[in-house]
Amino acid sequence: MANKNYQMSTGVTAVVQKVVEACQDESKRLDLIEIARSYPPNQLRNMQRTFQAITGTFLDAFLKKHLSKDFESLVLMLYKPRAQLLCELIRGATKGAGTDEKCLVDVLLTIETHEVREIRQLYYQLYNDSLGDVVRKDCGDKYMWAKLINAVATGDRIPRDTHELEEDLVLVRKAIETKGVKKDEVSTWIRIFATYTRADFRQLHKMYSAKYNGDSLRAGVEDEFQGLDEYAFKLAHDFLYDPCCAAAFSMNVAFAGSGSDSNRLNRITAMHFRECKGCKYYYKKVYGQAFDERCATELKGVYGDAIKLLWEPVTVPLLSMDDYQGSEQHRPMTLEL
């Protein structure tokens, strides 16, 4: 092994050894998942550096050598820093023979407000290109989902006052009551989903339900759009209301059809399993089936076990208080219905 004199904590060294054993022994594959869910991202980054120092091999290359198929793709995503993962997903979706519209929708419509600037900056550093320009150039503005993600990629979320909320309440009601998809009404939805803060959107949600006999904004979105447009606007609605809702919705869509969409399962899981502690609860509440039962039906082997395990609520252990550098906005999301 390379660089045997490399100094590191016993804890990190033990994690590296556990990764090596899990890759080499198929019966220990789920240890890779336990590591990902049990340590915060900054400690995983430290582990990757230690892994290279001890073994002389990049962790990504080692994982690719020993793992395969959907499980390999999932683990590779889990061990990447979140900002890097988001940038790589966007880059992969916009380069090549065609645009991966589903990936762009999943990523850009489920990024937290405090992350947007960091993602824009990192994307430029990695690829010497503007995130907004890339998305706009690749997707155009012909489709409503494209207009929405363009607005999210280039816009900012700004707090509203009570008067602005009341004005938008009128506009939203008009959009829902209007038959057919009209330009002005679509613009209203896009502006709200792309520029509202979560707190203001929840307030608008409550105001709408109170004023219109319990009617739901989400039902209005469902009646308004179809296909990928419907998915995108529902996802934007759910993520603003509670990321747990968005995760459960997206996972349910990934399970639908003749075969599960493992690409969507992987990216939604890797992006949100840490923060969305209420996903399984919400899934059962809305879709009427336990999440683990659906996984057992749709997914096979260690891959299915990994997906189930990652969405199980867990308290991430911090080795020291110095490892926690976030403020309230970075704390794990809890379900609020």
Curated annotation (Swiss-Prot):
Family: Belongs to the annexin family.
A cellular-component GO term for this protein: cytoplasm
Protein known as: Annexin E1
Subcellular location: Cell projection, Cilium, Flagellum
Chief location of this protein within or outside the cell: other
Keyword set includes Calcium: yes
Pfam families tied to this protein: Annexin (PF00191), ANXE1_4th (PF22293)
Functional note: May function as a calcium-regulated structural element linking phospholipid bilayer and underlying axoneme.
InterPro entries linked: Annexin, Annexin_repeat, Annexin_sf
GO molecular function, one term: calcium ion binding
Domain of life: Eukaryota
UniProt keyword terms in alphabetical order: Annexin, Calcium, Calcium/phospholipid-binding, Cell projection, Cilium, Cilium biogenesis/degradation, Flagellum, Repeat
Domain comment (free text): A pair of annexin repeats may form one binding site for calcium and phospholipid.
GO BP terms, alphabetized: cell projection organization
Annexin repeat start and end residues: 10-80, 81-154, 161-238, 242-312
Keyword Iron attached: no
